[in-house]
Amino acid sequence: MNFVQENNHVLYIWNGAISGEIEQEVNRLKAIPNVQVNVENADRVLLAGYTPSQFDVVLANVPSGNSEMASSLLKLVKPKGKVVFKDDSANAEATRSNLLLSGFINITSLDGNVFVGEKPNYEIGSAAKLSLGGNKAKVAAVWKLDVDDDDDERIDEDELLDEEDKVKPTAESLRVCGTTGKRKACKDCSCGLAEELEAETKGSAVANSEPKSSCGSCYLGDAFRCATCPYLGMPAFKPGEKIQLTDTQMRADI
C-alpha cells in the first residue's frame, strides 16, 4: 500500500473469486484519508467505461503478460501515475519487456512477483513545441538609409565619367592584337589583323611562285622557247620585264 497516498483515486482489480484477503486490502485502502477506491473484476475492466487518466494508482492482481490489459491500464492512469501488477506466475524479464512495449517507464520489480510501471509525464498523442532556432541576435541594419539624414554623401552621376571616356573609340584604338611590338593575331582575333596578315602571306606566296626561266631565252619568242615554257604563245618581251601569267597558263597541259 506504499504506492497509495492521500487524496488518490485508486482502481483495484481482482481476478477470480473474491477472497477475504481482497476485502482486507480494499478496507486498508479506504482507511487512507480522502482515498477513493473503485473495485473491478479483471474480466470487466475493459467494459466498465472508465475515462482516460482517471486514476492516480492502479493495483492489478492480473497476469502482467497480457499486453492488451497493460496498454489499457496505461490509458486509465494519470501522467506519472503508477500501475502495480501482482502476478505469481510472471517471469521478471518477460514482464519487464512487455511493460516497456506497452508504454511504461521506470519499471521495477519487488519481492512477491510485484512489478511497478510508471506512466510518462505526458498523454498519448500530446504534442510539444520545440524551439530549435534559439534566441536570434539582432542584426544591425548596416545598409539601412535614413532618408532624413542630410549627412549621407551621395555620388554625383555626372562626375563618374571624364571627357575622354565620352569620346567614341576608333577601330585602331580597339585593336588588341599586335600591340606588343610584334604583329601577331590573337587566337580569337576579331579586330581584322588575322585577315590582314593572311592576305599579306598569300601575296608573298604569289610573288615567290612567279616562274623563272631556266634557259634564259624565253623573252626572245616562241621560236626560242621550250615545249613546257609558261610564256609559250606570248609575244617577245624585254629581259627583266615583269609578265603577269593567268591561272590557266600556270597549269601543265598534261
Swiss-Prot record:
Subcellular location per the Swiss-Prot or TrEMBL entry: Cytoplasm; Mitochondrion intermembrane space
The keyword Mitochondrion is assigned to this record: yes
Main subcellular localisation: cytoplasm
Keywords: 2Fe-2S, 4Fe-4S, Cytoplasm, Iron, Iron-sulfur, Metal-binding, Mitochondrion
Gene Ontology CC: mitochondrial intermembrane space
Locus of motif Cx2C motif 2: 226-229
Motif interval(s): Cx2C motif 1: 215-218
Region listing for N-terminal SAM-like domain, in residue ranges: 4-132
Record-annotated disulphide pairs: none
Domain of life assignment: Eukaryota
Subunit architecture: Monomer.
Stored PANTHER family: ANAMORSIN
Family: Belongs to the anamorsin family.
The protein's name: Anamorsin homolog
